[in-house]
């Protein structure tokens, strides 16, 4: 195969945007791929399926973005009637804003450092969160038949990977991370957990 598939094209554009430090454009390109992937995995309404996809991948996202395992608790913002979690914040302030406004919501900003900073009015995510979202699309088992022309190598803390070698290999990536974590993580029930 030498032509990119439809999800492959979105992934390739998002990777190029990420490399050029254009996180807004990277997210504009990857969010439809997240939705399509989540639809294959969960079906149902768009909010449910995207939140479910992010929740399932939250540990992997944090390891890629921060270099460590972080699952954020639910919390309540002033004026909100229910508690929210990481998936709610991403859906409400990235996906929904992109669809309705064409850009990421003001609550989200990106930094070049390996950190996550949260306040009542601002979430500062490092740029590797965007790369993590892209990788979650790539490794979904529902995307095993995807492909990008002119393969890309992704450098992560735990290795270098060809995008075309990663399609649909979520479990393999989780095992690779666990096996290279000096005993910090293990794979359990198709997810990565702390030892």
Predicted regions and their residues:
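Hydrophobic/aromatic-lined pockets within catalytic cores
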Residues: 19, 35-42, 99, 103
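Sequence termini and other peripheral, non-core segments
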Residues: 157-195
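Hydrophobic core segments within long, regular secondary-structure runs in both alpha-
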Residues: 8-11, 51, 92, 96
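Charged alpha-helical initiation segments
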Residues: 1-27
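Short runs of predominantly hydrophobic/aromatic residues within well-ordered alpha helices
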Residues: 7, 23-30, 34, 87-91, ...
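Short, contiguous, well-structured surface segments enriched in hydrophobic/aromatic residues
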Residues: 28-71
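Long, charged low-complexity segments
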Residues: 58-129, 135-167
């Amino acid at each position: 195969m030498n032509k990119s598939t439809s999800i492959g094209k979105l992934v390739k554009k998002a990777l190029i945007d990420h490399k050029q430090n254009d996180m807004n454009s990277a997210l504009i390109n990857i969010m439809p791929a997240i939705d399509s992937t989540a639809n294959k995995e969960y079906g149902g309404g768009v909010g449910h399926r995207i939140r479910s996809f992010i929740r399932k991948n939250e540990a992997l996202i944090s390891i890629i973005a921060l270099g460590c395992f972080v699952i954020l608790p639910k919390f309540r913002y002033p004026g909100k009637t229910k508690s929210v979690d990481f998936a709610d914040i991403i859906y409400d302030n990235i996906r929904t804003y992109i669809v309705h406004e064409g850009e990421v919501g003001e609550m989200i900003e990106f930094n070049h450092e390996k950190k996550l900073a949260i306040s009542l009015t601002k979430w500062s995510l490092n740029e590797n969160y965007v790369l993590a979202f892209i990788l979650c699309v790539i490794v979904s088992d529902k995307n095993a038949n995807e492909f990008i022309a002119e393969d890309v190598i992704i450098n992560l803390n735990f290795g270098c990977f060809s995008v075309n070698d990663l399609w649909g290999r979520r479990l393999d990536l989780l095992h690779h991370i666990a096996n290279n974590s000096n005993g910090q993580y293990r794979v359990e029930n198709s997810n990565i957990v702390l030892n």
